[in-house]
Amino acid sequence: MALTKAEMAEHLFETLGINKRVAKEMVESFFEEIRGALESGEQVKLSGFGNFDLRDKNQRPGRNPKTGEDIPISARRVVTFRPGQKLKTRVEAANAGK
Protein backbone atom coordinates (compact mmCIF):
# COMPACT_ATOMS: atom_id res chain seq x y z
CA MET A 1 0.00 0.00 0.00
CA ALA A 2 1.27 3.48 -0.86
CA LEU A 3 1.10 6.62 1.24
CA THR A 4 -0.76 9.35 -0.66
CA LYS A 5 -0.76 13.12 -0.33
CA ALA A 6 -4.40 12.92 0.78
CA GLU A 7 -3.42 10.55 3.59
CA MET A 8 -0.62 12.89 4.63
CA ALA A 9 -3.07 15.81 4.77
CA GLU A 10 -5.52 13.70 6.77
CA HIS A 11 -2.76 12.84 9.25
CA LEU A 12 -1.94 16.56 9.68
CA PHE A 13 -5.64 17.25 10.25
CA GLU A 14 -5.90 14.52 12.90
CA THR A 15 -2.64 15.15 14.76
CA LEU A 16 -2.44 18.95 14.62
CA GLY A 17 -6.14 19.73 14.51
CA ILE A 18 -5.80 22.08 11.56
CA ASN A 19 -8.41 22.68 8.89
CA LYS A 20 -8.43 19.95 6.18
CA ARG A 21 -8.06 22.53 3.42
CA VAL A 22 -5.05 24.08 5.17
CA ALA A 23 -3.52 20.63 5.72
CA LYS A 24 -3.89 19.83 2.01
CA GLU A 25 -2.32 23.19 1.08
CA MET A 26 0.61 22.49 3.43
CA VAL A 27 1.30 19.13 1.80
CA GLU A 28 1.01 20.62 -1.70
CA SER A 29 3.28 23.52 -0.74
CA PHE A 30 5.90 21.13 0.66
CA PHE A 31 6.08 19.15 -2.57
CA GLU A 32 5.97 22.30 -4.70
CA GLU A 33 9.08 23.58 -2.89
CA ILE A 34 10.87 20.32 -3.66
CA ARG A 35 9.75 20.43 -7.32
CA GLY A 36 10.84 24.05 -7.67
CA ALA A 37 14.28 23.40 -6.21
CA LEU A 38 14.86 20.41 -8.48
CA GLU A 39 13.64 22.34 -11.54
CA SER A 40 16.21 25.04 -10.65
CA GLY A 41 18.94 22.41 -10.58
CA GLU A 42 19.34 22.43 -6.79
CA GLN A 43 19.90 19.46 -4.53
CA VAL A 44 17.20 18.90 -1.89
CA LYS A 45 18.47 17.79 1.54
CA LEU A 46 15.93 16.67 4.12
CA SER A 47 17.83 16.09 7.36
CA GLY A 48 17.11 12.70 8.89
CA PHE A 49 15.32 11.57 5.73
CA GLY A 50 17.51 11.76 2.62
CA ASN A 51 18.66 13.72 -0.41
CA PHE A 52 17.11 14.28 -3.82
CA ASP A 53 19.82 14.79 -6.45
CA LEU A 54 19.87 15.50 -10.17
CA ARG A 55 22.02 13.23 -12.30
CA ASP A 56 22.85 13.61 -15.97
CA LYS A 57 22.74 10.39 -17.97
CA ASN A 58 24.60 10.12 -21.25
CA GLN A 59 23.09 8.88 -24.48
CA ARG A 60 23.32 5.10 -24.71
CA PRO A 61 22.34 2.35 -27.12
CA GLY A 62 19.01 0.65 -26.56
CA ARG A 63 16.74 -1.83 -28.28
CA ASN A 64 13.05 -1.76 -29.14
CA PRO A 65 11.73 -4.84 -27.30
CA LYS A 66 8.99 -5.41 -29.86
CA THR A 67 11.03 -5.23 -33.05
CA GLY A 68 14.55 -5.84 -31.78
CA GLU A 69 15.64 -2.70 -33.65
CA ASP A 70 18.63 -0.83 -32.19
CA ILE A 71 17.65 2.69 -31.14
CA PRO A 72 19.57 5.35 -29.22
CA ILE A 73 18.28 6.35 -25.78
CA SER A 74 18.78 10.10 -25.58
CA ALA A 75 20.76 11.90 -22.90
CA ARG A 76 18.61 13.12 -20.05
CA ARG A 77 18.58 14.43 -16.51
CA VAL A 78 17.03 12.22 -13.84
CA VAL A 79 16.09 12.68 -10.18
CA THR A 80 17.63 10.25 -7.73
CA PHE A 81 16.91 9.75 -4.03
CA ARG A 82 19.50 8.66 -1.50
CA PRO A 83 18.03 7.77 1.89
CA GLY A 84 19.76 9.15 4.97
CA GLN A 85 21.24 6.94 7.66
CA LYS A 86 18.37 7.58 10.10
CA LEU A 87 15.79 6.52 7.51
CA LYS A 88 17.79 3.42 6.57
CA THR A 89 18.11 2.43 10.23
CA ARG A 90 14.39 2.85 10.94
CA VAL A 91 13.36 0.89 7.83
CA GLU A 92 15.79 -1.91 8.64
CA ALA A 93 14.53 -2.05 12.25
CA ALA A 94 10.90 -2.14 11.11
CA ASN A 95 11.64 -5.01 8.70
CA ALA A 96 13.94 -6.98 11.02
CA GLY A 97 11.11 -9.12 12.39
CA LYS A 98 9.58 -9.93 9.01
Curated annotation (Swiss-Prot):
Keywords: DNA recombination, DNA-binding, Transcription, Transcription regulation, Translation regulation. CDD domains: IHF_A (cd13835). The keyword Cell wall biogenesis/degradation does not apply. GO terms for cellular component: cytosol. GO terms for molecular function: DNA binding; structural constituent of chromatin. PROSITE patterns: HISTONE_LIKE (PS00045). The keyword Transcription regulation applies. Residues 49-71 are annotated as: Disordered. It comes from the Bacteria. Pfam families: Bac_DNA_binding (PF00216). One of its GO terms (biological process) is DNA recombination. InterPro entries: Hist_DNA-bd, Histone-like_DNA-bd_CS, IHF-like_DNA-bd_dom_sf, IHF_alpha. PANTHER family: DNA-BINDING PROTEIN HU (PTHR33175), INTEGRATION HOST FACTOR SUBUNIT ALPHA (PTHR33175:SF2). This protein is one of the two subunits of integration host factor, a specific DNA-binding protein that functions in genetic recombination as well as in transcriptional and translational control. Belongs to the bacterial histone-like protein family. Heterodimer of an alpha and a beta chain. This is Integration host factor subunit alpha. It comes from Shewanella sp. (strain ANA-3). The gene is ihfA.
